[in-house]
Amino acid sequence: MDLKLNGKTALVTGGSEGIGKGIARALAQEGVDVAICARRKEPLEATAAEIAKETKRKIVPITADLSKDADTRSFVEQGHKALGRVDIMVNNAGSSPGGVLEHLSEADWEQSLQLKFMGYVRCLRYVLPIMVKQGGGRVVNLIGNDGVKPSYWEIAPGAANAAGQNLTMSLAGQYGKDNISFCAVNPGPVRTERWAGLVAAMARDMKLPHAEADKLAPSSIPLGRIAEIEEVANLVVMLASPLMHMVNGTQIEIDGGQEKSLMDRLRDRK
């Protein structure tokens, strides 16, 4: 199937590694020129060079900390200038610390909201006027299934994600008249560079051996495994296609049918 993406342009946040890198690569493979951002310059530039060499597309690395408004504005403006227009905005940067309520500090909660939620708000504040002026666009927000499938160990991510999901649905209602459509993608556990750290945190909080903690997430998923980066990236690329423009104001889980309550019960038995 031709996704009608060849020649399009995209901004992808958190693009130096993990899901963001996978999305940038998958978009470029479909003929999209991409501007990516991250806080660390060296891995960001290495990723851009790697994807550009592989796909022969224009990949623009822009160093930015999306917890800072000035950096966010600079990323959007530089990306727009380098690409000429912004057809697709993929918000992906940011993560929230897992943990139970008594282990989460004020700084943990601030981190959850400042980057994972407010980072998306900042990007949209600057990119949506560009899309309005050019006659339309597509926004895909990577959020997380914690916002719709609560778990006591993921209370901070759940709160930030629920806010992001509400933001996505609300903006779909506001900007439809401008031919801008919105969709949220809610991954469950994904095998990224961060996965080992998340398992270590679960092992700490639940007082489990690392090997046992690593089995908790797969045990809560009917398919028996966590997702791979490429699986999430493929869904995002499909949703970014003009063919999917009517998939608007909605959210899609990609978590293998995970049952979060089962994961909590498995923890409670330990």
Where are these regions (language model features)?
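Conserved glycine-rich cofactor-binding loop
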Residues: 9, 16-18
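Substrate-binding pocket helix/loop in short-chain dehydrogenase/reductase
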Residues: 100-101, 108-113, 217
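Short, small/polar-rich loop/turn modules that mediate ligand/substrate recognition or access, typified
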Residues: 176, 181, 247-249
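Conserved glycine-rich Rossmann-like NAD(P)H-binding loop of the short-chain dehydrogenase/reductase
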Residues: 32-46
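A conserved structural motif in NAD(P)-dependent oxidoreductases
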Residues: 206-210, 221-232
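Catalytic loop of short-chain dehydrogenase/reductase
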Residues: 140-163, 168-177, 189-190, 258
